[in-house]
């Protein structure tokens, strides 16, 4: 009974099928929007270094971790083991929580920038907030599908 339960659920894809399965297809969009967040925050003025430092940490950490995971999935490093399904679900739940906190803090930092900063820097931060919330949504959706896959594995 235990081997059937371990092999009966969804497994992680390997090779280029990573780009054709629903939750793993979101890696591409997480990569794009996460990269845009840290590029925009890095290019703008930083009114609150501690707040935007957290935003930078979260966006760069998730960018590097997402890149690492997608490369490991493409080369098939997981070998079909269920522990990787658990890792995938745990990572995406943590990333979703971190990105939500970073999005709220970036919005707070942007609100405080209304006066005394250039129009360009203010709009860069507005774009960073929008892309940060999009990245948060992507990580939440990926986390939900990863938890469903984890439960069925």
Curated annotation (Swiss-Prot):
The chain crosses the membrane at residues 25-46, 54-75, 93-114, 126-147. The keyword Manganese does not apply. Lipoprotein. Keywords: Cell membrane, Leukodystrophy, Lipoprotein, Membrane, Transmembrane, Transmembrane helix. The lineage of its organism: Eukaryota, Metazoa, Chordata, Craniata, Vertebrata. PROSITE patterns: MARVEL. Its main location: membrane. InterPro entries: MAL (IPR013295), Marvel (IPR008253), MARVEL-CKLF_proteins (IPR050578). Residues 1-24, 76-92, 148-153 are cytoplasmic. GO terms for molecular function: lipid binding; peptidase activator activity involved in apoptotic process; structural constituent of myelin sheath. Belongs to the MAL family. GO terms for biological process: apical protein localization; apoptotic process; cell differentiation; central nervous system development; central nervous system myelination; membrane raft polarization; myelination; positive regulation of extrinsic apoptotic signaling pathway via death domain receptors. GO terms for cellular component: apical plasma membrane; endoplasmic reticulum; hinge region between urothelial plaques of apical plasma membrane; membrane; membrane raft; plasma membrane raft; Schmidt-Lanterman incisure. Residues 18-151 form the MARVEL domain. This is Myelin and lymphocyte protein. It is found in: Membrane; Cell membrane. It is linked to Leukodystrophy, hypomyelinating, 28: A form of hypomyelinating leukodystrophy, a group of heterogeneous disorders characterized by persistent deficit of myelin observed on brain imaging. HLD28 is an autosomal recessive form characterized by developmental delay and nystagmus in infancy, followed by significant learning disabilities and progressive motor deterioration within the first decade. PANTHER family: MARVEL-CONTAINING POTENTIAL LIPID RAFT-ASSOCIATED PROTEIN, MYELIN AND LYMPHOCYTE PROTEIN. Interacts with PLP1. It is a multi-pass membrane protein. It comes from Homo sapiens (Human). May be involved in vesicular trafficking from the Golgi apparatus to the cell membrane. Plays a role in the maintenance of the myelin sheath, and in axon-glia and glia-glia interactions. Residues 47-53, 115-125 are extracellular.
């Amino acid at each position: 009974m235990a081997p059937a339960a371990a092999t009966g659920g969804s497994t992680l894809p390997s090779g280029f099928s990573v780009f054709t399965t629903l939750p793993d297809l979101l890696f591409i969009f997480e990569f794009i929007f996460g990269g845009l967040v840290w590029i925009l925050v890095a290019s703008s003025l930083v009114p609150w270094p501690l707040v935007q430092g957290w935003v930078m940490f979260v966006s760069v950490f998730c960018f590097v971790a997402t890149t690492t995971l997608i490369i490991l999935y493409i080369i098939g490093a997981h070998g079909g083991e269920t522990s990787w399904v658990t890792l995938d679900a745990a990572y995406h739940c943590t990333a979703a929580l971190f990105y939500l906190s970073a999005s709220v803090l970036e919005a707070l930092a942007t609100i405080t920038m209304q006066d005394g900063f250039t129009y360009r820097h203010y709009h860069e931060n507005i774009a960073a907030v929008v892309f940060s919330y999009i990245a948060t949504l992507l990580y939440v959706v990926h986390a939900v599908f990863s938890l469903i896959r984890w439960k069925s594995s």
